[in-house]
Amino acid sequence: MRDVRGDVVRRQLKADHNISVAKVRSICGYLISGETPSEAIAERVDDLFADPIIELGAANTTMLTTPSFGDGPETVITVGFKPGVTDNPGKAATDGFLTLFPADGDAKIATYTTYVFYGLPADCDANWLAGTLHNGLIERALVADRAACADQSWPELTFPTPPEQVFIEPQSIDLECDDATLEEISTTGLLALNLNEMHAIQAHYR
């Protein structure tokens, strides 16, 4: 079956960066934090997490270790939301999960996407490639380069548990600073603003 998500990435790399890739496959992953036994979840994978007509589903395992991906990818990049960032697909999956397992009322689900590359140019840097696939302000990415793929050392994200909320007294922030410091303020303050937006705030308070 055609992998639409993978094809979109492959075409964008060619259109935006003139990088030709033979094939890109994708994996939609779900991380579940709850009390439901893993065996019970495994029995309902095709009811909630995968479309059995066009997708392969598995539970309690990494899809990259299954025969479906036994053809030796050259680079693997996994992208998921950072802790505390709204994960709308995860919220939708949580709603469906609670319909199937209503007793697990505190369960939460986080999503991630893994991109699997074949026929990648030898001079294409895996970390640069990851930078084109995710927004570093709100997402995190793990990379398996050629060496890691050869060793079958696959990237695995953990559940993005938000840190404990601690009240912090309001603080004054000096916005008369260089661009690098503005970007650091946006990142550490979880503002998720790009540099142009930070410039607008800086100009507003001058």
Predicted regions and their residues:
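Core nucleic-acid recognition elements
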Residues: 1-206
